[in-house]
Amino acid sequence: NGLCAHNFYCYMNNQLLEYKKMIDLRDLFHGLQNQMLASLNVNREFIEHPGSKGDATEQHWIEFLRTYLPDRYKVDKAIVIDSTGNVSEQMDVVIYDAIYTPFIFKQDGFMYIPAESVYAVFEVKQDVKGYIEYAAQKVESVRTLKRTSIGMVASGKTAAARPLTKIIGGILTTTSSYSGNDTVKVQLRKLKGLQTLDLGCLCDTGSFYVDYNETEPEG
């Protein structure tokens, strides 16, 4: 069907000054979602080995995020490490700072990323069913790490240390085999403290974002 376009007209004294077609951004993003879903479904249907299927799905999410996030953010599969040597579980998707990330270790696809550089972490699964709590536990393994922040000198002036912000945690899946949203909401309500999930994308079903200042998870 292609993208829908809206016509834009501008008149003055019955004279047409400007005419152009405007792309419907909602249709554009819906097209990107369908493209993503088609690729994930190909992996799901035709890659039979569970480990290989998981690796392919994780890499597809990583490449998608690399394409559409600003250049200052990097995306990789990695283990997060803190200054005391403690490490997280291996995270399927880590979004981290591309500019201020010091070199720790990267070899043959294996990476350690310092906790101070991490903005968000995600667990990737084929189906959300049965994995909300599992994803929450992996997110917790990152949030429990020690993070430090120090001041810096810029233009001859000392700037105060930047406050540490919450590391976003979530889950990315191809589908949901639950009959509705209620089960996911119940599971999200049970998560407390460092295990809370902030958002999730269930590619063929929808997405959720949780504002913990509210009493009801939105989805």
Residue ranges and their predicted role:
Residues C4-H6, L16-Q90, I95-G219:
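Intrinsically disordered, low-complexity Ser/Thr/Pro/Gly-rich regulatory segments
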